[in-house]
Amino acid sequence: MPISSHSHSGQFCLHAQGKLEDVIQEAIQQGFQSFSFTEHTPRDRVEDLYPEELHLQPEDLFKTFDEYVNEARRLKQNYGDQINILIGAETEYIRPESVELLKSLNTKYNLDYFVGSVHHVNSIPIDFSPELWQKALQHVGNNPEQLFIDYFEHQYDLMQRLHPLVIGHFDLICLFAPEDAKEVFKNSKSVWELIQRNIKYAVSYGGIFEINTSAFRKGWKTAYPQQRLLELMVEQGAQLTLSDDSHGPHQVGLNYHLAKSYLDKCGITSLCMIEKGPDGNGTVVKNVTVDNVWSKFVGTNGITNT
């Protein structure tokens, strides 16, 4: 029975579609055993708004997040007898000060967990568009190695100070990287030393790396992380989970058949499923076999939706 540890809805994310209730209903229809709500955390500065949010103010984002948590709790109450539902959030690490905001949100809402993601390098978005990726590159003197280094330094800072249970799309920095930059990524000793350090640190505190299938719909031949990284994680004894990173009901379980082939190719036979702890306190992590994750999966979505 499938799982997803990372998702969004158009109700609370402007670049997604559909209502949160539509998302969980689709997950139930497809036979999911466990599904996590993880809308984006709000940002507290006007300069950090995305182009799609320029008509808003930071206080609007905080109001939306509050509405999200309340709706997620309602849905858990209504559907919790049909599916394991967790209520978390995906981090917005824009600068070091962002971590204090994340901690305050967790204190206020007692979230089940964070998906620890980095979408910005030196406060510039790196996964919103190729143009903004290039802007981030220009900020570091058009030195792709430095851009990769800064990304993994940000990721390390986030992990050290927040200990997110799930590490989101570990190599997102590569999404819009042109071929010459990808060669730098592949061959840079400095970059790979940071990668190994980050993986080792996550393993040390019990962090879980997601196999994120959204990379397939964005044109990759693998999920996040790419194969060399995934093999390194396995070598270091990392825990792995599965995420569709769906942005609406039309993407629930999308490309999971490709993920199964990818995991089989990499020799991965088990994944982690996150559940609430005894009496509803905290979370517990259970190991499930890859074959069990795909049993009773009724994938109703297409292959190439974006």
Curated annotation (Swiss-Prot):
Q: What is its EC number?
A: 3.1.3.15
Record's catalysed reaction(s): L-histidinol phosphate + H2O = L-histidinol + phosphate
Gene Ontology terms, MF aspect: histidinol-phosphatase activity
What InterPro entries does the entry give? Answer: Histidinol_P_phosphatase_HisJ, PHP_dom, Pol/histidinol_Pase-like
Q: What does the entry give for GO biological process?
A: L-histidine biosynthetic process
* Gene Ontology cellular component list: cytosol; nucleus
What pathway does the UniProt record associate with this protein? Amino-acid biosynthesis; L-histidine biosynthesis; L-histidine from 5-phospho-alpha-D-ribose 1-diphosphate: step 8/9
What is the protein name given in its UniProt record?
Probable histidinol-phosphatase
